[in-house]
Structures are given as C-alpha cells and as structure tokens.
C-alpha cells in the first residue's frame, strides 16, 4: 500500500481515538447536537479503522513469518512459507477493501430522496408503466424498511400516473436510488392490443436528495409565484370544495411544483416548498458535478430525460441496464422490487470509476 494512503489511515485511526475520548466527556454528553455529530462521525470511522487494524495485524504476521524463515529447522521454514502466503493474501484483500472505504463519499447518500416518475412517449401505456415503476419502488422501499409518502400525483386516464412525486425516507435512500435517474423504456403488448403487437413506451425518472432545512438554498419569496386551485385528486368532498392545492413557480429557473395530496393548503405548500428546494438544489448539484466530472463518465444520471438507462422487455422477461451492459432474465423479480440485482453491480461499477479517477490523481 502507498505510503500516502498509510498516512491517511493513521490519521483516521488517531481521529477515531480522539472522538472516542470526546464521547466520554461530560461537557460533550451535555451538548446533544455535538454528541450526535460525534457519534455519527465515530460510526463512519469505525469500519475503516477496523479494516486498518486488521491490515496492521496482517502486516505484523507477515513480518513474523519472514523472521521464521531464518530458522534452522526445515519444518519451521515450511510453516513460515505457508504463513507468509496467507498473510500476503489477507493484505491484498484488506488493501482492496480499504481503497473502497477511502473513496470520497457523496455527503447526500444518507439523506431522504424524492422520486419523480413521469410518463413520456406512449400515451396510456406509458402512464400505466409509470404506475408499475411506482409499485416497484414501493416494494423496494418496503424491503429496505423505508417510508414512502406521495407528495403529488396526476393519475392516468386508464390507470397508472401521468406524473407522480414521492418522498422516500430512510437511511441510505438517496445513496441507492440516485442510480434510477434517467429514461426507462418498456416493451410489451398492451392489454388493448388485439393483434398482439409489442409497443414501446417511455417513462422518465428523476431522483433528488432532500435538502435539510439547515442547508436549504435561500429562496427569495419575491421569486415565487403561488397559485391555489381545487384539488382534482382523491381525498373526499372536502378537498373539492376548497382551494387546497398549491402550484409554486420559481421565476428565475422556471421550475414549477404542484402539490394537492393533502387536505390542508398549509401542508400542500410545505410539501411543495420541500420539493422545490430539492429541485433547485439538484440544478446546482448538476452544475457542480458537470464541472467535476467533465473528464470522466458518471453512472449517476444527471436527470437528463433523454438518457435511456434501462429497458424492460416483457415478452422476453428481460431487463437491460444499458450503462453497464447488464442483461437479466428476471423481469418479474425486478418489477416486484428486487432492484439490488441491478443496483449492486451499478454501485460496484461506480466505485471502480472512482478508484480509477483516484489512481489518476495519485499518478
């Protein structure tokens, strides 16, 4: 392992010990915000520190085995050869693990996520598939013990959704779901198709991270145009009698957000503002990402809706993930929420890209 990497790991080990000592300090325990922040830092350091300690032990085992090679006893030398072989293999394994643990982490990975699903080309069939994707994400959220909340929806005439925005709350939600942004294409025979012909439809998905209130971009109220209107969604007669639905337009960017899922205008406005903040932040994030990643590709889609990321072929039971040339013949399982079969290889490829970039930087 490079000396610069060893020094970085030694610094993290030292910081881990400092944080542990601080967590036992009475003044820190009395300050809930600081205690919470240090506890989070300690848990983030724990895995890499444990890996580095194991690496140090494997290095000590290797050094010890090398000393045993100097023994006169042939049996001891043979044993030393075996121990050296095992220690070298362990060092290689741990070095690979530590390299991944040291990769720069997206600070937003642990935040909640907003998913926008919009029907594109394909009319009714696209809206129906948007509903299928919503169900797929709901199942995936359930498997991860995340909470899903519908922020806004516009139902399709024959089922599904023309557009639906949901909030996914839970640890690591954005970190996993961010890979879903992009164009999703479906190929299947619609129920209304009497000739059995396969139709192609498109749905776009945009995933954004929730912006914590403390970090939210300052939005000037003068830049907002707020309209109220009567909700057209479900919710009972009360909804249709009052102008509880909200449409907010951010004039500088042209971003428009509608929320009509709640009975209360106040709640709809609060939800619309949180989605608006996420959208504005997403625009800023993309500007930064474009500047940082202009020299290398990224598997995390920019939200460019023309970028096709995945095709779902129902007649063949096939899912094709175009970004990494992955083909799976387990469409039913994926549509039932088994997204890890796709997301895990995507994350691994993303890590490989980051490692390659890191190697280039280190020369």
From Swiss-Prot:
Which superkingdom heads the taxonomic lineage of this protein's source? Answer: Bacteria
PTM summary from the entry reads: Methylated by PrmC. Methylation increases the termination efficiency of RF1.
- Where are the N5-methylglutamine residues found in this chain? 237
Which keywords annotate this record? Cytoplasm, Methylation, Protein biosynthesis
The molecular function GO annotations come to: translation release factor activity, codon specific
Give me the ranges of the annotated region Disordered: 284-306
Q: List cellular component terms (GO).
A: cytoplasm
Q: Where in the cell is it found?
A: Cytoplasm
Segments of skewed composition (Basic and acidic residues):
284-296
Q: Which InterPro entries match?
A: PCRF, Pep_chain_release_fac_I, Pep_chain_release_fac_I_sf, Prokaryotic/Mito_RF, RF-1
Q: PANTHER family recorded for this chain?
A: LD18447P
Q: Which family does it belong to?
A: Belongs to the prokaryotic/mitochondrial release factor family.
Purpose of the protein: Peptide chain release factor 1 directs the termination of translation in response to the peptide chain termination codons UAG and UAA.
What is the official name of this protein in its record?
Peptide chain release factor 1
């Amino acid at each position: 392992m490079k000396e610069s990497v060893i020094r970085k790991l030694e610094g993290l080990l030292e910081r881990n010990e400092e944080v542990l000592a601080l967590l036992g300090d009475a003044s820190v325990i009395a300050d809930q915000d600081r205690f919470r922040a240090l506890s989070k830092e300690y848990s983030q350091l724990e895995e890499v520190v444990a890996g580095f300690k194991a690496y140090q032990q494997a290095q000590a085992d290797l050094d010890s085995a090398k000393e045993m090679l100097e023994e006169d006893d042939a049996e001891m030398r043979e044993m030393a050869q075996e121990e050296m072989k095992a220690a070298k293999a362990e060092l290689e394994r741990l070095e690979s693990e530590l390299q991944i643990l040291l990769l720069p982490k997206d600070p937003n990975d642990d935040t909640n996520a907003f998913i926008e699903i919009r029907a594109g080309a394909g009319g009714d069939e696209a809206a129906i598939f948007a509903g299928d994707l919503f169900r797929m994400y709901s199942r995936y959220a359930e498997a991860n013990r995340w909470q899903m909340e519908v922020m806004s929806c516009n139902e399709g005439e024959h089922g599904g959704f023309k557009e639906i925005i949901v909030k996914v709350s839970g640890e690591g939600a954005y970190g996993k779901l961010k890979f879903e942004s992009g164009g999703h294409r479906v190929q299947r025979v619609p129920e209304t198709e009497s000739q059995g012909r396969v139709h192609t439809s498109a749905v776009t998905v945009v995933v954004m991270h929730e912006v914590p209130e403390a970090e939210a971009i300052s939005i000037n109220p003068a830049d907002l145009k707020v309209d109220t209107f009567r909700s057209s969604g479900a919710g009972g007669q009360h909804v249709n009698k009052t102008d509880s639905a909200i449409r907010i337009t951010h004039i500088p960017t042209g971003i428009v957000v509608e929320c009509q899922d709640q009975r209360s205008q106040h709640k709809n406005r609060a939800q619309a503002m949180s989605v608006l903040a996420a959208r504005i932040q997403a625009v800023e994030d993309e500007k930064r990402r474009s500047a940082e990643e202009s020299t290398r590709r990224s598997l995390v889609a920019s939200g460019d809706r023309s970028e096709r990321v995945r095709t779902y072929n129902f007649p063949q039971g096939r899912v094709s993930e175009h970004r990494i040339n992955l083909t799976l013949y387990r469409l039913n399982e994926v549509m039932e929420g088994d997204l890890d079969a796709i997301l895990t290889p995507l994350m691994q490829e993303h890590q490989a890209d980051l490692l390659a970039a890191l190697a280039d930087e280190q020369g």
